[in-house]
Amino acid sequence: MSAPNHSYDPVEVTPLHPDEVARMRDEALEAIAKASTLEELKKVRIAHAGDRSPLALANREIGALPPAARADAGRRVGGARREVNEALKARQAQLEEEHEARVLVEETVDVTLPYDRIPRGARHPLTTIAERMADIFVGMGFEIAEGPEVEAEWYNFDALNFLPDHPARTMQDTFFIAGPDGEESGMVLRTHTSPVQVRALLDRELPVYVVVPGRTFRTDELDATHSPVFHQLEGLVVDEGITLAHLRGAIQLFVERMFGEGLRTRMRPSYFPFTEPSAEVDMECFVCRGASVGNPEAPCRTCSSEGWIEIGGCGVVNPRVLVAAGVDTERYSGWAFGLGIERTLMFAHGVKDMHDMVEGDVRFTAAFGMEM
């Protein structure tokens, strides 16, 4: 049997033939020279110097050559790739310089033009409305409380009497935080500001009178009336002898100071795990004052001619929540409420679309915000 032939003929491996390597290099250099914009040069870089470029694929085939032939082929391919990369670098520097020169010409500032006042910034309307809402309750003797936005499930659900099978505890409603290993961590993006109720009861001496403005998160699609990120103003009172009448009075005072004197409020029975009894709070429409009800000739867009506008939920704090926070339910009672800050802004300023609040358009901020 004759011995195997280990000699290397570069013609047998077409991508590594000297002429083929030179052709690939020349094609790359020609494409680089023709690139007239940085975007075109980016495409040339991918095509002629990327991981799937002809020279890169040829470089991978060097390992299949006989050992004696690898060094020569490696120098040849490596030299070609080096030339291509150096040409890319030089062309990019040239195009960047040309782009900068073009921008300087196109965006030249004529210093001889008359001076215009520089537009002043404005605080976001959500910030100003949240502070205004909180200030009303601070005027009643409440304190501001805050809590983390990444919250433990115990504070967000268990301590607030959410049963394990409650729909809110599913991924369809809640953003769950994965641990470092990708498994469950027991943490969520808080779905409401109510966890701060429990934290306030655990951290403060009784009695507790707090309001909690803050950002919350739910898996809602962004549309005209919903957003996955929204803001709430939570209120909590826990003291001796507290009744639903005190809650009704606080809500009434808030509505009158926020929307106008003489507006009526009402409560409709509802259900929340952390309050019992629970209620939805409506206020009399501050535009039509009920005059549009049953009057097709004078419809009201604000209340849809119903005469009432829903503004939030409330109720007497469920004893189980107080027990979870270590409060003596024989001695203390309390109530809580939750108001939507975006919803309040929509009513106060006639904002129709949630997109306007979250997309960061400075024109919206300038129109409804407070100038700095």
Curated annotation (Swiss-Prot):
GO cellular component: cytoplasm
Pfam families reported in the protein's UniProt record: Phe_tRNA-synt_N, tRNA-synt_2d
Entry keyword set: Aminoacyl-tRNA synthetase, ATP-binding, Cytoplasm, Ligase, Magnesium, Metal-binding, Nucleotide-binding, Protein biosynthesis
EC number annotated for this UniProt entry: 6.1.1.20
Cofactor annotation comment: Binds 2 magnesium ions per tetramer.
Keyword Transcription regulation belongs to the record: no
UniProt cofactor(s): Mg(2+)
PROSITE patterns: AA_TRNA_LIGASE_II
GO-annotated biological processes: phenylalanyl-tRNA aminoacylation
Residues binding Mg(2+), per UniProt: E276
MF terms (GO), sorted A to Z: ATP binding; magnesium ion binding; phenylalanine-tRNA ligase activity; tRNA binding
Subcellular location: Cytoplasm
Keyword hit for Isomerase: no
InterPro entries: aa-tRNA-synth_II, aa-tRNA-synth_II/BPL/LPL, Phe-tRNA-synth_IIc_asu, Phe-tRNA_ligase_II_N, Phe_tRNA_ligase_alpha1_bac, Phenylalanyl-tRNA_Synthase, tRNA-bd_arm
Catalytic activity: tRNA(Phe) + L-phenylalanine + ATP = L-phenylalanyl-tRNA(Phe) + AMP + diphosphate + H(+)
Superkingdom per UniProt: Bacteria
Family per similarity comment: Belongs to the class-II aminoacyl-tRNA synthetase family. Phe-tRNA synthetase alpha subunit type 1 subfamily.
Quaternary structure and partners: Tetramer of two alpha and two beta subunits.
UniProt cross-references to PANTHER family, sorted A to Z: PHENYLALANINE--TRNA LIGASE, MITOCHONDRIAL, PHENYLALANYL-TRNA SYNTHETASE
Record protein name field: Phenylalanine--tRNA ligase alpha subunit
Organism annotation: Thermobifida fusca (strain YX)
Lineage, broadest ranks: Bacteria, Bacillati, Actinomycetota, Actinomycetes, Streptosporangiales
Gene, per the UniProt record: pheS
